[in-house]
């Protein structure tokens, strides 16, 4: 066993506009090459567009969209004997958020719209409506876990 001390998780500073740690994490995931101010402008513009379309507050709409994309179970590879099984495991809360944010950003980048803020707002709107690529990804992960339910006893 290593004798080094256990390093705690870094505390993330809340975003300047809404004072939300969740939104700050989302901005960090969207950020490319350390250009945080550009990422902030993209996210805030997308949230403004989203709030106009849904008549909900920006942060409230974002949290609902994120909730619709969060996975509850996923599959992990586990080697038993000579074969590898896809074992369904429950996803920890921090990882749920991270996966949901990553999937939303990835699917927004794949979209074909004029600007990134428009793509992001459309993807968040689709997530609010329980449709779109990010929600499809979550459904796919859940389907995989359901299909491999028989191997759940290999959990560690």
From Swiss-Prot:
Keyword entries, A-Z: Ribonucleoprotein, Ribosomal protein, RNA-binding, rRNA-binding, tRNA-binding
Taxonomic source organism: Buchnera aphidicola subsp. Acyrthosiphon pisum (strain APS)
Encoding gene (name): rpsG
Family: Belongs to the universal ribosomal protein uS7 family.
HAMAP family in the record: Ribosomal_uS7_B (MF_00480_B)
Keyword hit for Ribosomal protein: yes
Subunit structure as annotated in this protein's UniProt entry: Part of the 30S ribosomal subunit. Contacts proteins S9 and S11.
GO molecular function term, any single one: rRNA binding
NCBIfam families per record: rpsG_bact
GO cellular component: small ribosomal subunit
Family annotation (CDD domains): uS7_Bacteria
Protein name as annotated: Small ribosomal subunit protein uS7
Function: One of the primary rRNA binding proteins, it binds directly to 16S rRNA where it nucleates assembly of the head domain of the 30S subunit. Is located at the subunit interface close to the decoding center, probably blocks exit of the E-site tRNA.
């Amino acid at each position: 066993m290593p004798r080094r001390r256990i390093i705690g998780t870094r505390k993330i500073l809340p975003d300047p506009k809404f004072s939300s740690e969740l939104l700050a994490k989302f901005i960090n995931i969207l950020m490319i090459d350390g250009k945080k101010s550009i990422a902030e402008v993209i996210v805030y513009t997308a949230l403004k567009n989203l709030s106009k379309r849904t008549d909900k507050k920006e942060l409230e709409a974002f949290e609902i969209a994120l909730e619709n994309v969060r996975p509850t179970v996923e599959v992990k590879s586990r080697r038993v004997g000579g074969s590898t099984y896809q074992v369904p495991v429950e996803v920890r809360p921090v990882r749920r958020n991270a996966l949901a944010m990553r999937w939303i950003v990835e699917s927004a980048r794949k979209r074909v719209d004029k600007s990134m803020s428009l793509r992001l707002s459309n993807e968040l709107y689709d997530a609010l409506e329980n449709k779109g690529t990010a929600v499809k990804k979550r459904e796919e992960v859940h389907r995989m876990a359901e299909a491999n339910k028989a191997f759940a006893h290999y959990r560690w």
